[in-house]
C-alpha cells in the first residue's frame, strides 16, 4: 500500500515539474539538455500578449525549443525571409548559461554562445532587417536571463568582519564577462539607434527592467558598471516616460546608502548620470529638483567613503549652483552642516568643492552665509594638519573668491586675522607660514586702516589673554602657598 502511494506522489511531482515554466531559460520552454553542468535561468519577465495581428502571425513562426547548444548558420547564409526565425533560434542558444568558475567545463558550448552573441550584435548594428515585436520581446528576455542575477557578496559579508577601506579592496571581476560584455553591447545597440520605436520598445524596457538594471550598479566589477552607466543614460534620454521613475529610484538608492548601509559600489556612476541629467534641467528649476538637492545630494557628504564618489558629487552640486545661483547659500550651509571634524582627508575634499561653489556664487548669496563660512575657514587656516591649512590658504589664489572677500573684507578680516597671525608666529610648516604672510600682506595693501584696526584688536586681545593667564597663575601660586602655610601650622594634616 505504501509503495502505491509513493508511486502516485512521484507521478504528480513529475507532472508538476513538466508544467513549471521556471525550470527553463526561455519561452516557449525547453529543457537545458543532457549536460547537468549547464545552468538555465528563467527570464525576468513573462510573455506579453501580442498586440496586433502582425505580432500574432509572427508568434506562430517561433522555432521549437532547443535542448542543446549547437552552431547555427550565419545570417548571410540564409535568405532574408528566414533571418527573423534564425534570430530567434540564436536567442535561444544565448539563453543557456554556464559555470565560468571552471574554464574547462563546457568550453565548446561557451565558445558557440560567444560567437552567436557576436553575430547578434553585428546583426543589430548593421540594421540588416527591422526586428519584429516578437524578436524584440525575446531578445529582451534573453538579455534579462543573462544579466539579472544574484551578485556575489562583498568580502566583509563573507567573513563577517568590519568592511575595510573601499579604495584598498580589490574589486571582484565577473568570470562570465566574455559573455556579459557582448550582451550589454547587444542591449546598447538595441537602445541607441534613432530608428528604434520607443512606443514598442517601452513594452519590454519597462519599469521592472529599469529597476533591475539599477540594482546591478552594486556590482563590484567596474567594467560592468561602466556599461550600466552608458545604458541607463541612453534609456533616460530615449524613454521620456521613464525619467521621473529613474530619478525616484536613484533617490531611494541614495537614501539607503546614506542612512543604512554606507556601502554601494555604483554611487559614482549614478552621480555621473545625474550630472548629465542636471545639466539638462529647464529653468526655472522645479521644486522637485531643489528638494532632491537638499534631501539626497547634500547629505551624500556624510558617509565615510565619500572619496570614492566625491568628484562626481561635486560636479552635480556645482551644476545646481550654476543653473540657479540662488541655491549657493543652501549648498554652502549644507556643506558646513556636514563638515568633517576629525577626517583631514575629507576636509581637503570639502575645501576643494567649496572653492568651486564659491566660483559660481554671487555677492548677495555670499553675504548671507559669509560669517559661518569664514568661521569654518578660520578653523581650517589654523589647522595643525598642513594639507588642510594649505588648501584653505589656496582659496586666495582664486580671483572670483578674492573679489567676494574684498567686497566684504570688513566682516571677513576680523574673523580670520587671528588664524593668520598664529600661522605666522608659530605654525610648524614653512609653506603655511609663507602663504599666511602673503595673505596678510594682501589685506594690508587692500585696506590699511582696517588692517591696522584688526592688528590693534588682536594685540589687545592677546594682552588681555596674557593678563588673564597671569591672574590664573597667581591664583594657583597663592593657593599653593596657603596649603604650605597650613601644613606648617598643623603637621597632622599631612601625617
UniProtKB/Swiss-Prot annotation:
Residues 1-61, 462-495 are annotated as: Disordered. Residues 1-13 have a biased composition (Basic residues). One of its GO terms (cellular component) is protein phosphatase type 2A complex. Expressed ubiquitously, higher levels in leaves. The keyword Cytoplasm applies. It comes from the Eukaryota. Residues 49-61 have a biased composition (Polar residues). It is found in: Nucleus; Cytoplasm. Pfam families: B56. Its main location: nucleus. Keywords: Brassinosteroid signaling pathway, Cytoplasm, Nucleus. The B regulatory subunit may modulate substrate selectivity and catalytic activity, and may also direct the localization of the catalytic enzyme to a particular subcellular compartment. Required for the formation of the PP2A holoenzyme that positively regulates brassinosteroid signaling by dephosphorylating and activating BZR1. PP2A consists of a common heteromeric enzyme, composed of a catalytic subunit (subunits C), a constant regulatory subunit (subunit A), and a variety of regulatory subunits such as subunits B (the R2/B/PR55/B55, R3/B''/PR72/PR130/PR59 and R5/B'/B56 families). Interacts with BZR1. Interacts with BRI1. Interacts with SRK2E/OST1. Belongs to the phosphatase 2A regulatory subunit B56 family. This is Serine/threonine protein phosphatase 2A 57 kDa regulatory subunit B' alpha isoform. The gene is B'ALPHA.
Amino acid at each position: 500500500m505504501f509503495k502505491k502511494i509513493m508511486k502516485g506522489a512521484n507521478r504528480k511531482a513529475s507532472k508538476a515539474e513538466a508544467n513549471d515554466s521556471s525550470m527553463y531559460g526561455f519561452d516557449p520552454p525547453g529543457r537545458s539538455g543532457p549536460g547537468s553542468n549547464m545552468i538555465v535561468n528563467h527570464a525576468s519577465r513573462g510573455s506579453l500578449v501580442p498586440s496586433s495581428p502582425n505580432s500574432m502571425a509572427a508568434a506562430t513562426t517561433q522555432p521549437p525549443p532547443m535542448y542543446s547548444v549547437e552552431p547555427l548558420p550565419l545570417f548571410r547564409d540564409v535568405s532574408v525571409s528566414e533571418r527573423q526565425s534564425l534570430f530567434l533560434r540564436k536567442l535561444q542558444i544565448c539563453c543557456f548559461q554556464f559555470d565560468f568558475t571552471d574554464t574547462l567545463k563546457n568550453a565548446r558550448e561557451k565558445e558557440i554562445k560567444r560567437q552567436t552573441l557576436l553575430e547578434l550584435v553585428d546583426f543589430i548594428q548593421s540594421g540588416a532587417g527591422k526586428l519584429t515585436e516578437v524578436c524584440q520581446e525575446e531578445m529582451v528576455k534573453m538579455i534579462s536571463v543573462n544579466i539579472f542575477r544574484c551578485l556575489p557578496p562583498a568580502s566583509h559579508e563573507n567573513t563577517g568582519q568590519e568592511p575595510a577601506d573601499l579604495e584598498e579592496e580589490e574589486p571582484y571581476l565577473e568570470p562570465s564577462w566574455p559573455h556579459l560584455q557582448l550582451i550589454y553591447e547587444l542591449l546598447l545597440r538595441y537602445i541607441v539607434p534613432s530608428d528604434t520605436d520607443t512606443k514598442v520598445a517601452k513594452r519590454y524596457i519597462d519599469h521592472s527592467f529599469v529597476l533591475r538594471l539599477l540594482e546591478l550598479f552594486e556590482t563590484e566589477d567596474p567594467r560592468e558598471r561602466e556599461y550600466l552607466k552608458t545604458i541607463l543614460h541612453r534609456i533616460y534620454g530615449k524613454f521620456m516616460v521613464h525619467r521621473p521613475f529613474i530619478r525616484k529610484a536613484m533617490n531611494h538608492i541614495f537614501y539607503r546608502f546614506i542612512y543604512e548601509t554606507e556601502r554601494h559600489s555604483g554611487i559614482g556612476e549614478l552621480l555621473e548620470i545625474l550630472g548629465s541629467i542636471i545639466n539638462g534641467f529647464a529653468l526655472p528649476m522645479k521644486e522637485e529638483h531643489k528638494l532632491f538637492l537638499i534631501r539626497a545630494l547634500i547629505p551624500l557628504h556624510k558617509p565615510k567613503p565619500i572619496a570614492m564618489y566625491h568628484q562626481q558629487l561635486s560636479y552635480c552640486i556645482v551644476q545646481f549652483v550654476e543653473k540657479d545661483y540662488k541655491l549657493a547659500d543652501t549648498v554652502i550651509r549644507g556643506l558646513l552642516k556636514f563638515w568633517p571634524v576629525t577626517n583631514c582627508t575629507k576636509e581637503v575634499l570639502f575645501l576643494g568643492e567649496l572653492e568651486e561653489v564659491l566660483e559660481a556664487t554671487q555677492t548677495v548669496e555670499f553675504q548671507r552665509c559669509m560669517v559661518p563660512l569664514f568661521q569654518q575657514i578660520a578653523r581650517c587656516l589654523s589647522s595643525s594638519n598642513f594639507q588642510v591649512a594649505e588648501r584653505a590658504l589656496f582659496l586666495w589664489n582664486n580671483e572670483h573668491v578674492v573679489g567676494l572677500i574684498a567686497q566684504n573684507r570688513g566682516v571677513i578680516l576680523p574673523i580670520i586675522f587671528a588664524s593668520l597671525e598664529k600661522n605666522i608666529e608659530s605654525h610648524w610648516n614653512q609653506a603655511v607660514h609663507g602663504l599666511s604672510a602673503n595673505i596678510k600682506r594682501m589685506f594690508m595693501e587692500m585696506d590699511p586702516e582696517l588692517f591696522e584696526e584688526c592688528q590693534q584688536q588682536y594685540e589687545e586681545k592677546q594682552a588681555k589673554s596674557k593678563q588673564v593667564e597671569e591672574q590664573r597663575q597667581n591664583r594657583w601660586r597663592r593657593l599653593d602657598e596657603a596649603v604650605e602655610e597650613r601644613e606648617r601650622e598643623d603637621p597632622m594634616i599631612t601625617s
